[in-house]
Every structure is written in C-alpha cells, then in structure tokens.
Amino acid sequence: MARLGVVGYGPLAWADGKRTADIEKVLGEGRVLWMETEHFKFGSNFGFARAPKDPKARRLLKGELKRLHKKCKKVPTSASKLDPWLRLHLYAQRAEELYDEFADLAGRPHGERRLGEKQKLLILLFEKKSDLARYFKSFCGRETQQTQRHTHYGTGHRSLVMTAEGDDGPRDSETTHAQFRYFAMQMFMDAAGGGPLWLQYGLGHVYEREVPCNMINCGVRADESVDLASQYEWGKKIRKRVKFEGLVVPFEELTTKTDLGYYGHVQAWARVEWMLQDRARFAEFLGAVLGKPSRARQVAALAGVYELEPAAFDAAWRKWCAKNYR
C-alpha cells in the first residue's frame, strides 16, 4: 500500500464535517471506492474502460502502468481493459504526478502542503452525470451535471468533481483523462492562490492536450463561427488567426478578460505554449502573478521576466505561432 503512495482506504473524513459514509447514504452503500494519498482524498465509481485506440494515448497509458508496476508488481505493465480499482490507482498516480509538476513549476518547496492548501484536495470520479448531480446538490448546494471545481469554504477543502459521461453518452478513457488534466491544473492554481483566467485556462489546455482526443473543454459563443469537424485542431486555428492582428486578443485585454469564448481559449493555450519554451522564465512569471492577478501585476511580471512590453509580447508570440503551428 505504501509503495503505491496510498495512505489509507475508506471510510474517510470529508469536507464540511461530513464523512464518506454520509456520501454513501445519498449515493448508495458500496458504490464508491475511497482512497487517500499524500495530497489527495479520492472517491471513484468509475467502471471498466477499454484502453485507448490512439497509438500515442496507448503509449502514455503503458508508461503509466509501468510506473505503477515498479511500485507494485501485481499491476500489469499493459492492459486492454482497465478495472475500477486499477483506474482509481491510475488517477491517484496522475494526480500526484501533476501536483508535483505544478508545484515545481510554481517554485514551491517540497513539503506536506506544497501549494499552501489548508486541507488535502478532494477528487470525485463519477461514471454517470446523475451521481455527480446528486453529490453537488446534497453536499455543495449546487445544481449541475457538469464536471466542475468546488471550494468548501467552511473547512477550506478544494475539490474536483467530474463525470465520465458527456452529453452524447459515456466518454472513452483518453477523453476522460484529458479532461481530468485540464481541471486538475486549474485546481492546483486555485490552491496556490489563484491566477488570471487566461493563464489558468491556458495551462490547463496545455496539459489536457498532451492526451490525444477530440474533445474541447471550452464553449463556443453565439457570435463565434467554429467548424465542428475541426474544432479540436487548435494549431491550425491559431496559425490562421495570428496572420491578422484584429483577430487576436491583445495581452493587455486578455489579462482581465473573463469571457474568453472558443478563440480566447485557443489563444490562451498558444500563449502558454510559447511561454513554456523557457520553463524557468514561465515559472518565474507564474510565481509573480499567483495570488496577484491584476493587469498591472501581469504587465510588470511580463516586463521583469520576459523583458517585453505587451505589444512586443504579442508580436513575438504571433511570429512564433506562424512558424511552429501547422
């Protein structure tokens, strides 16, 4: 158990003075697997899932299984089908690895609460939207069927509650994994003090898109025209748009923008990709704006770290996009 990074299994204490037994009274006893690791508490009723068909996604999964196998020889190094317990251990490993990567990127020292969170982070993985909706209504006072982050202000717990069911039915394992990465990186930024929305979204998309899938984790505004067949081909989209200055959101405007729309999300992703070409500089920029996301702070951090004024940043980024995306 310890070699897998597991601190313990259920029952567990949860948020707002509740326990996992209270959650099971609502969702049904024995329907959720509970587990605790160094930085997280998990609940999952994910069912069986097939391994990805995409070659890159299969290689990613095989690498994850090999890392788990090194910790516990009972874990297979490859699998065509993932059972509920294996999926839970995979997500626990994914969460801890992403946590450490974000903490390193943010320049946080090693320790029990590297990001400054008051409590362990909570992650709930539901197979169906109906279970997610019941949980949100009963324990968060919210009406939703969508994967979301939530803060329990009474006890200081931050949580990610997600479902493997989309509007068109069950999602495959790689799509669910990609969405998990997107929301997890945002939760970590919340725990570290919060940051500008474009940076939260952009960093989340960078990590999300490392897992091949055709899902997009953003909405399309009514005033935007997006071809559904190619909506996930962000490299092609941004390469075309940066040719025209009027089609990109200037950095100074992006710093405080709250409704990014589809193309704003694409641009946020591409800006973070450009900034991550120098990870040391990006880490310095991230550390400078965490908890201090004002426009003035972002502009000052850009000048101090990248030695660029906003207009020069826009020009350098557009030139890089035109050269590197196809």
Model-derived regions: residue spans:
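Short low-complexity stretches enriched in small and charged residues
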Residues: 1-3, 74-82, 227-230
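N-terminal pre-domain segments of enzymes
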Residues: 1-26
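Juxtacatalytic substrate-recognition/specificity segment
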Residues: 14-15, 32, 36-196, 295-301
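General structural signal for secondary-structure boundaries
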Residues: 16, 23-24, 47-49, 88, ...
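Short hydrophobic/aromatic segments of transmembrane alpha-helices and their interfaces
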Residues: 24-26, 169, 264-265
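Feature detects long, helix-prone N-terminal segments enriched in hydrophobes
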Residues: 26-27, 64
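Acidic/His/Gly-enriched intrinsically disordered linker/tail segments
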Residues: 142-163, 194-326
